From Swiss-Prot:
Protein name, as recorded: Protein OPG176
Source species taxonomy: Viruses, Varidnaviria, Bamfordvirae, Nucleocytoviricota, Pokkesviricetes
Domain of life: Viruses
Keywords in alphabetical order: Early protein, Host-virus interaction, Inhibition of host innate immune response by virus, Inhibition of host IRF3 by virus, Inhibition of host NF-kappa-B by virus, Inhibition of host RLR pathway by virus, Viral immunoevasion
Family statement: Belongs to the orthopoxvirus OPG176 family.
Organism name: Variola virus (isolate Human/India/Ind3/1967) (VARV)
InterPro entries named among the record's database cross-references: Poxvirus_Bcl-2-like, Poxvirus_sf
């Protein structure tokens, strides 16, 4: 049974793979464009897949062959915990999406990123006071002033910059300055050094594995330049 999935490259593809002891089957749960697919097959079967990027239409294409005896289910808008696979560059896209659409994003990664708000509050206190009185983010030069404020922080703690940027983006959406959100998101995502992404990605992995209640905590992490993939498994919905 062959399958062919094409999805816009700006979208995040979430997948959870686990073995179900109750059904004695290997289960793959995918989320593509708010549609959830469940695939079940015997654990001794082989699934062949090929993932490629089509630069002509800016899409990610997934092709593969499933065993003949495969159960496939499909539901729309059913919340499930997922395994998130991403490299450092696509993680920047995740951060940009979080900054750009703070008021509407949903899912495990974005919920985890929101715990960074506590880190910002501990450091700056009243965020509304910071935005309105000190930075005056609603002024004509508000976007420029905010970028100048975070430019010295971005190389030493990207977590604070991401949290502040998402909060000011949320503020602008509520004050009819939504047009600033996209510009800020693209600037921040481009400005964060690749080397600085290790800490938030590592802490995010720890959070999604249930090892900590927030991602503001400091951990001993390592640079993984030799690895382009980070895999996070949420054990809460598996019976492994």
């Amino acid at each position: 049974m062959a399958f062919d999935i094409s999805v816009n490259a700006s979208k995040t593809i979430n997948a959870l793979v686990y073995f179900s002891t109750q059904q004695n089957k290997l289960v793959i749960r995918n989320e593509v464009n708010d549609t959830h697919y469940t695939v079940e097959f015997d654990r001794d079967k082989v699934v062949d897949t090929f993932i490629s990027y089509n630069r002509h239409n800016d899409s990610i294409e997934i092709r593969g062959v499933l065993p003949e005896e495969t159960n496939i289910g499909c539901t729309v808008n059913t919340p499930v915990s997922m395994t998130y696979l991403y490299n450092k560059y696509s993680f920047k896209l995740i951060l940009a999406e979080y900054i750009r659409h703070r008021n509407t994003v949903s899912g495990n990664i974005y919920s985890a990123l929101m715990t960074l708000d506590d880190l910002v509050i501990k450091q700056y206190g009243d965020i509304d006071l910071l935005f309105n009185e000190k930075l005056k983010v609603d002024s004509d030069s508000g976007l420029f002033d905010f970028v100048n404020f975070v430019k010295d922080i971005i190389c030493c703690d990207s977590r604070i910059v991401v949290a502040l940027s998402s909060l000011v983006s949320k503020h602008w959406e509520l004050t009819n300055k939504k047009y600033r959100c996209m510009a800020l998101a693209e600037h921040i995502a481009d400005s964060i050094p690749i080397s600085e992404l290790s800490r938030p990605r590592y802490n995010l992995c720890k959070y999604l594995r249930g090892h900590t209640e927030s991602i503001e905590d400091e951990f001993d992490y390592f640079e993984d330049d030799d690895s382009s993939t980070c895999s996070v498994v949420t054990d809460r919905e598996t019976d492994v």
